[in-house]
Amino acid sequence: MCLRIGSLNVDEFRKVLMKTGLVLVVLGHVSFIAAAVLHGTMLRFVATTSDAVVLQYCAVDILSVTSAIVVIVAGISTIVLSRYLPSTPLRWTVFSLSVACALLSLTCALGLLASIAVTFATKGRALLAACTFENPELPTLAPDCPFDPTRIYSSSLCLWAISLIFCLAESMSAVRCAQLMHGLLELRPWWGKSCHHTIQASPEPLDAHDLLSCASSCS
């Protein structure tokens, strides 16, 4: 029972998968928290308006939450696969989730970038749609404003920038995971050298003896 992908033996490959899965889980949780904080501090107050810019903000936030959930699921699946490499259905599941994560995270990053650009272009006027001021150019605390209008602009831009960074990191990690699955599934085209032997379709994790025998036979 042996598996070798490129220069990695089974033990090394399992460790790489485990680390990749953990990275995806952490990034997904942070992105989810950032999107939730953004919704709680700003979007829930302006989401009732019919402004096109506000609708774009809400759509991007929903996409961010969806992307974060898919990334977390992909990370957990990758961690499980690191323990159960013989499972072919699980390999395809992780590969599909990784590709979906990469596309969703990239789309989310583009949406966040658009939100930041629109906010700069409009000077954040859409963020103050729920408030009424005598002078829109000088927002001050008002009884009919559900939040602090003097901080909503900088807070929103900061949260969007954080989410953008993590979406890009998610996309790169998902691409890395998809690359690992591409080699494990031996899909074509594949230019890396590999030594692949049949693995028994057993749900049990590979033990240390199997790993050592694999490393020696494929070296």
Curated annotation (Swiss-Prot):
Gene: Tmem54
Protein name: Transmembrane protein 54
InterPro entries per the UniProt record, alphabetical: Beta-casein-like
Ranges that cross the membrane: 22-42, 62-82, 94-114, 155-175
Source organism: Mus musculus (Mouse)
Membrane-topology annotation of the record: Multi-pass membrane protein
Similarity section: Belongs to the TMEM54 family.
UniProt keyword terms in alphabetical order: Membrane, Transmembrane, Transmembrane helix
Keyword Nucleotide-binding recorded: no
Single GO cellular component term: membrane
Compartments where located: Membrane
Primary localisation category: membrane
